[in-house]
Amino acid sequence: MKIGVIGGGQLGRMLALAGTPLGMNFAFLDPAPDACAASLGEHIRADYGDQEHLRQLADEVDLVTFEFESVPAETVAFLSQFVPVYPNAESLRIARDRWFEKSMFKDLGIPTPDFADVQSQADLDAAAAAIGLPAVLKTRTLGYDGKGQKVLRQPADVQGAFAELGSVPCILEGFVPFTGEVSLVAVRARDGETRFYPLVHNTHDSGILKLSVASSGHPLQALAEDYVGRVLARLDYVGVLAFEFFEVDGGLKANEIAPRVHNSGHWTIEGAECSQFENHLRAVAGLPLGSTAKVGESAMLNFIGAVPPVAQVVAVADCHLHHYGKAFKNGRKVGHATLRCADRATLQARIAEVEALIEA
């Protein structure tokens, strides 16, 4: 089976690494000449709206999937004429636009911060008055890793904020005094079978994920599964989806979904019986899903901007290095380390060792 992937970054790379043992081959459509997944399959170098090369991809593969959600709707519609596409167009339409996403949460009865559509500075002024400050102004599309957003703490911050984000459609979200950030990675098969990985505790730095620690018997696991299950069923979703939540007053409030394999699920490569990457491929290919059970105590640390010396990273016991082969650049995810340990105390010690290498 040959899988087409829109995007050739590290997520596409890790999909290929997981799919090769299953006998799968890959073709990546990505305009970047240095796409880091290119060495693991065919690289069709073209823009995401280039219909000639999209048709070439469709003709060569058995199905198409995505490594990011900001795919032009026209691209999805065009590909769907010629080849199965997973996840479906509706899933991408909802997930790429924060207004549609938040509206879906509300329709499904999933708690989420107060929000308002912002199409102008006047809209922002009215929304800030209604929701109150502090609040977060976000572009409706394209923002990720802390980009495309601005925290508004006082009235002076509101003035000119719409222009600061490019005068594009935005959403204002009420600030949530959360006690923690967690995410749930789930996988849904073509026949609707659904499996969930353990909830993960996430730590961010300047909006970029820094550390994910897989939980054991989290008291909110069942609630998170309920909320995620509602979304998967509504979208008739196929593949892996990640749902990020805020922990608030002993419950959960929805932050956002990602209709793809997700950074907070990287720990599953060594820390679960079947990784998120393999399970995504199993789902879209119509294969039986793998077990999402955790193996040992696991965590993932991102390498942002640079990877510490390889010899030092692999010298840490229970540590597995994943180097993306990308040029080092401030703010860029260029690799990660996964840790799988026998117990929680050992895991915390190993996290501290890797953090020391990152900070050195």
UniProtKB/Swiss-Prot annotation:
Pathway: Purine metabolism; IMP biosynthesis via de novo pathway; 5-amino-1-(5-phospho-D-ribosyl)imidazole-4-carboxylate from 5-amino-1-(5-phospho-D-ribosyl)imidazole (N5-CAIR route): step 1/2. One of its GO terms (molecular function) is 5-(carboxyamino)imidazole ribonucleotide synthase activity. It catalyses: 5-amino-1-(5-phospho-beta-D-ribosyl)imidazole + hydrogencarbonate + ATP = 5-carboxyamino-1-(5-phospho-D-ribosyl)imidazole + ADP + phosphate + 2 H(+). It comes from the Bacteria. Its EC number is 6.3.4.18. GO terms for cellular component: cytosol. Residues 102-285 form the ATP-grasp domain. Keywords: ATP-binding, Ligase, Nucleotide-binding, Purine biosynthesis. Signal peptide: none annotated. Homodimer. Catalyzes the ATP-dependent conversion of 5-aminoimidazole ribonucleotide (AIR) and HCO(3)(-) to N5-carboxyaminoimidazole ribonucleotide (N5-CAIR). Belongs to the PurK/PurT family. This is N5-carboxyaminoimidazole ribonucleotide synthase.
